[in-house]
Amino acid sequence: RGICSEPKVVGPCTAYFRRFYFDSETGKCTPFIYGGCEGNGNNFETLRACRAICRA
């Protein structure tokens, strides 16, 4: 569950992927745009995956 407390990382690349991260302040999985590189573990392809891992 450590990845769920990691910050959202958009990354320096310029791709446009809609992903989800767990926002530890709100306790919810939230969409964001991921650039495609240099992210972290708090980066999920689907809302369902985010909720399953982080129990949101």
From Swiss-Prot:
One GO CC annotation: extracellular space
Localization annotation: Secreted; Nematocyst
Domain of life: Eukaryota
SUPFAM superfamilies, A to Z: BPTI-like (SSF57362)
Effect of S5L: Very weak gain of function on Kv1.1/KCNA1 (IC(50)=15.6 uM), Kv1.2/KCNA2, and Kv1.3/KCNA3 potassium channels
Alphabetical keyword list: Disulfide bond, Ion channel impairing toxin, Nematocyst, Protease inhibitor, Secreted, Serine protease inhibitor, Toxin
SMART domains referenced in this protein's UniProt entry, alphabetically: KU
Domain BPTI/Kunitz inhibitor stretches: 4-54
Coiled-coil segments on the chain, per record: none
Disulfide cysteine pairs (residue numbers): C4-C54, C13-C37, C29-C50
Annotated site residue numbers, Reactive bond for trypsin: T14, A15
InterPro entries: Kunitz_BPTI, Kunitz_BPTI_sf, Prtase_inh_Kunz-CS, TFPI/VKTCI-like
GO molecular function, one term: toxin activity
Function (record text): This protease inhibitor shows two different activities. Almost completely (95%) inhibits TRPV1 (IC(50)=6.9 uM), the capsaicin receptor, a non-selective cation channel expressed by sensory neurons of the pain pathway. The toxin also shows a weak inhibition of trypsin and chymotrypsin activity (Ki=0.2 uM and Ki=0.7 uM, respectively). Shows analgesic effect on mammals. In vitro, it shows cytoprotective activity in the oxidative stress agent 6-hydroxydopamine (6-OHDA)-induced neurotoxicity model.
Family, as annotated: Belongs to the venom Kunitz-type family. Sea anemone type 2 potassium channel toxin subfamily.
Further information: Negative results: does not inhibit Kv1.1/KCNA1, Kv1.2/KCNA2, Kv1.3/KCNA3, Kv1.4/KCNA4, Kv1.5/KCNA5, Kv1.6/KCNA6, shaker IR and hErg/Kv11.1/KCNH2 potassium channels. A synonymy between H.magnifica and R.crispa is controversial.
Name of the molecule in the record: PI-stichotoxin-Hcr2h
Origin organism lineage: Eukaryota, Metazoa, Cnidaria, Anthozoa, Hexacorallia
